[in-house]
Amino acid sequence: MPRKILFFATICYSFFLGVMSLVKSSHLPEIDIDNSDKYAHALAYGLLCLVWYLTLCSYNFLNALVLSSFIAVIYGIIIEVLQGVLTEVRTPDFNDFIANCCGIIVVSVIISIRNKTQVKNL
């Protein structure tokens, strides 16, 4: 995928995630699973880490995994703060931040294992 398109897609996903985190969610369908919102947070921020990793790799950034993880964590913190400051319909939740970090960690571990396996196969 051309890196400009990948960069644009990454920015769009980041924006989409921010908007979905700040708008009223009562119009969204509810899932009857305990802590389903925490799974959604883990998935969303794991994906955020992945798309930033792929984008940074396409630009040949050293330590792309560390930087993409950092971007995703900081973005999650900013969104949680904005939920408390900008909206009346959303509230910041430390457990959401923990779920975000869990998703980021899972994706980072998978990427690390994949990268080490690829190097050994050469």
Residue spans for each PLM region:
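Bulky hydrophobic segments
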Residues: 1-95, 101-122
